[in-house]
Amino acid sequence: MISNCLDSRGERRGILQVSRRATWIWSICSLCVFLILFYTLSTSYFPQNQPPKPHTTNIITTNCHKKPRTDVAQNDTKTSDTALPMLLAELWKPLVHPLTERVFITDKGERFEIPADQIRWKSPLGKRVVIIDTDTRLDDKKENTMLHDCPLDIPSLPGRTGGHLNHYIYAMIHGYDYRLVRAADYPDRHGTWVKPAITKEALKTHDFVISLDSDAVFTHLDLPLEWLMNLWDVTPETLVAMAYDLDWKGDYDSRGNLILNTGFVIAQASQRTQDMFQRWEDCPRSTPGCEHWNFKWAHEQSAFSHYIRYEFNRTHDVKNIPCNHANGNEYSLNGNCECQGVFVSHNWKSKHKTPELLSRSIMTSLARRVHAQFHNDIKDLYIDASSQTYPIEGLGIQ
């Protein structure tokens, strides 16, 4: 019995050893097959001699040689300096809305009509108007900006540059002056406080100063400022015109009135206007409580609405522009913002959208202009050969 038991155990031990050996051999074979398959697949999908990855280039630097040629400029320096503004003015001239035409319909079909007794500005103001961009952050070393020497790259254009371009183009179309001002930082205030100081100085040389934030853009390049001034009832006695802010809880002053937004300001020169802007600039130093707005949002905007507008409160001193006309934009709240910025789109939370608005406004105008030119020459440019049979002979394309 013992012998039989040992024999039986020996047989079982032998069977187990054979089984383990077979399992081990199977594992080795499986691993080899896996490695061979992995190598085959990896070399087929990821060849060893891969082409080198494309070298990432700086688009601005690469295209810096593509500056407009200066050797084709006219010999008359004065003429060449004014060539582009004159060209843009002539190009847009057939599209510009007449100043005395009371009705304007936007591209979205919105109808605006000026009351007959508000048609005051009937002639172009030209160089009496200056559009000003004021900023403390301007740097001529920063690429893709107005001050940088290399040509702009539109696909990567920053929002701030898009705003500056929009203002400059609008000024050239309508014959206004334009200035881009790099202001010094206030040592004891937020950077936006420089706007009243620069505007006050510009009012010494121009009758009207239009101050805009870089994220506020003109949506209709064909609509003159004079027409908008008529719509907003700007009179010869008006000191400034600004748009209401949005009807949100934080946008009311201490007296319960909706504050005005300083992202778009029309200022008219007069001694009283100088006094207003001086008081505005001095507000944190001379008015108790105004220093609260040195760094607290909305800075100079809150100071004006909480204090200055109540000092200059004659009937026409401060014109309140409807928020929907010159504040807000079409992007906020998924396009459902109460203020759509119909004439001046202020993109405070969508600053990156200004290049899109710039491109849209330019291409809309150019497409209409080119289309009109085609129809003007349609007898020479269009041939109706639909009644011809093939092979065609004698069509006479000249």
Set out the residue ranges of the language-model regions.
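Catalytic core and acceptor-binding pocket of nucleotide-sugar-dependent glycosyltransferases
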Residues: R21, W26-S27, A197, A267-Q398
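Short coil/turn segments at secondary-structure boundaries
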Residues: E143-L147, A183, L223-L225, Q278-W280, ...
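N-terminal anchoring/stem segment of glycosyltransferases
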Residues: G14-T205
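Active-site-proximal beta-strand/loop segments in catalytic clefts of secreted hydrolases
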Residues: T134-R137, V181-A184, L212-S214, A243-L246, ...
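N-terminal Lys/Arg-rich, disordered targeting/topogenic segments
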Residues: M1-S19
